[in-house]
Every structure is written in structure tokens, then in C-alpha cells.
């Protein structure tokens, strides 16, 4: 399926999506997430962009690592497809909400072309809690397999329970 043909969450409500999400699973190929207890916190800015704060605990250093960026819809008519930018020199990253119920789970997909030679696909299963029920995890993997072709064995369970609380 071509990247532009991937169905996204219909009637996406960005305000309901705001708040804290915990990473439950991620693609194995994501090199910049090496910590535990990974979280994403989204807040709506006055200009309708989204402040993105990603945090992960680094157990070897016993510190929280964080990065902040800004997300905006690629197209106002398709608010579930966002572009996220963390560094001014870096092109924005692709962020597509394939599915969310806003209160429990979010299935997020990203695709990027590398030098127009090949595409890199990535996915995340996010939850409002750190450890989602198995039925929701299975539902998320089914969405990935049916819509993007990513299979369960291309994902890692995000390690949890090693970090001191920040809240």
C-alpha cells in the first residue's frame, strides 16, 4: 500500500488526544529510543500546533532524558497525519494516527524515504497506561499487519518499571 493510501483515524479530535501516552511497543529499527518507561506528552499550543515532550529513563545513568518538539497537521483536512520537528536543522518526522480510542490506546505509524532509495516504516503502540491489556495489544498488531504490513515480530516491548516517578 502506498504511503498516501494508508487509512488514518477518522474524525480525529486533537484535543481529546492531548495528554500523556506511554510507549508499550515500538519498532525494532528505532535507534533513538534506548531507555525504559518511555512517555510522550502532548499539549495544544495557542497557535494550534502541538508541543511534544518525549521522555525516557536511562537506567545506566539513572537520569531522565527528554526532548521537546512541535507537531502540526500535514493538511488541516487530515488532522491525524502530523509532522513532528525536534531540531531546526532536521526535516520533520512523519506521525500518523491509524487508530485511537483516546482513553486507552493509540496506534501510530511513520514512513520516511531515505535518499529516495528505500522507505523506512516504523510503528508505536501507545497507551494511557504503561501496560495495556493483551486484547488491546493484539488489536493494535492486527491494525499494523492489515494496514501497513508491519508484523508483530518487527516490534519490541518497551521496558517499564525501572524509573523513579516524575509526577
Q: Across the structure, where does each feature detected by a protein language model lie?
A:
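A beta-rich soluble binding module of mature secreted/lumenal proteins
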Residues: 1-167
Amino acid at each position: 500500500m502506498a504511503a498516501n493510501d494508508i487509512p488514518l483515524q477518522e474524525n480525529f479530535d486533537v484535543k481529546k488526544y492531548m495528554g500523556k501516552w506511554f510507549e508499550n511497543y515500538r519498532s525494532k529499527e528505532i535507534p533513538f529510543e534506548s531507555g525504559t518507561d518511555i512517555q510522550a506528552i502532548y499539549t495544544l499550543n495557542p497557535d494550534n500546533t502541538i508541543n511534544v515532550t518525549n521522555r525516557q529513563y536511562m537506567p545506566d545513568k539513572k537520569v531522565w532524558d527528554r526532548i521537546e518538539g512541535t507537531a502540526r497537521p500535514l493538511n488541516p483536512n487530515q488532522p491525524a497525519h502530523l509532522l513532528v520537528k525536534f531540531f531546526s536543522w532536521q526535516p520533520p518526522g512523519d506521525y500518523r494516527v491509524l487508530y485511537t480510542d483516546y482513553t486507552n490506546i493509540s496506534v501510530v505509524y511513520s514512513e520516511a524515504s531515505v535518499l529516495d532509495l528505500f522507505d523506512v516504516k516504523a510503528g508505536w503502540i501507545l497507551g494511557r497506561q504503561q501496560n495495556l491489556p493483551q486484547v488491546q495489544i493484539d488489536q493494535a498488531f492486527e491494525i499494523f499487519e492489515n494496514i501497513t504490513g508491519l508484523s508483530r515480530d518487527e516490534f519490541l516491548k518497551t521496558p517499564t518499571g525501572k524509573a523513579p516517578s516524575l509526577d
